[in-house]
Amino acid sequence: MRLTVLVGPGLVADAALLASSTAAACAELDVTGRVVTAGSAGEMRSLLAATEQPVVALPGPTPAARALIGAQPSGVVWYDLTVEPPVPGAVHLAGRGLWGLAWAIRHAVHRLRAPAGRIAYGPDPDQWGDLRLPSALDTGPAPVAVLLHGGFWRSIWGADLMDALAADLTRRGYASWNLEYRRPDRHGWDATTQDVEAGLVALRELARDRPLDLDRIVVLGHSAGGQLALRAAADLAGRTSGPRVALAVSLAGVLDLAEGERRYLGDGAVAAALGGSPATAPRRYAESDPMRRLPTRVPTLLVQGTEDSLDLVDANRRYAVAAAGAGDDVRHLEQPGDHFAVIDPASVIWQDTMTAVDARLGR
């Protein structure tokens, strides 16, 4: 497979750094890569039409080139280095800087290697999930792995962060449901939490004509998604109807919102997401802070890399003690690894995570 990074006219970036970043990301994925620069919007249009996928297109600032976003082949992944509003109907990532080019490349490759069905669970463009079903279902309906991405609840980060895990889980025999949700910086905190629950409830409809085992649902959330996973599991456990979570997995999760707000975690990400401090937004903290929701009565696996932020290591250790003290069934898996090792299918910590998940779900 050869991936093309197509650079639009006027893009503000060092060409050599674009080339080396592309080469590094492609090597990680075992694909070849190249960077092609278009001198005009017309040339970019022609190259898009003629270039075999996967393609990551960086449109740059010119209006004529930006007008191509979403108007060219549907498989193109568009990436803006700068923060830009989403373009409806396009596969469009934005705002992660040059470092984020690697994520756009990963997304383009995973979309081709492990195609998913994108299914809306609501009317907003951010209310969807990518569903992947395992190829072999000889033993009956598949357990369901629901994935919740992180990114400190900010809109520049999306469900593409969990593509690799979604593909890996499907290879392991799980149906993977990689959820996108409205983020609070654009829609408010309540929209975020409502979407996560709605995405889980949507599994009932999906299971009507698909082989999904709703008695074996595992919710895996990374970073900020770890908090969302634990809240959703606790919320559904208290409902009289709807799916129940058999196992909640926090992957380097943000598990103490009040203390995280006091420590200015993520440059103030907690207060920005919840709309204030525990003093000014008490309901939201009471409903959403994992420390405040104990006991959840949901089996929980905490996974944390020791080379991650010390504040996350600290919060996970304290949560494990508090959850056990409250009577919850909780396991704390702490091993070498950084913040992204826990969502890397090749890492030891992920292999051990799946050993624990399989055992809990009887696989």
Residue ranges and their predicted role:
Residues 188-208:
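Alpha/beta-hydrolase active-site loop
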Residues 221-225, 229:
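Gly/Ala-rich beta-loop-alpha elbow adjacent to hydrolase catalytic centers
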Residues 20-39, 79-139:
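N-terminal cap/lid segment of alpha/beta-hydrolase-fold proteins
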Residues 202-222:
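Gly/Ser-rich "nucleophile elbow"/oxyanion-hole loop immediately N-terminal to the catalytic nucleophile
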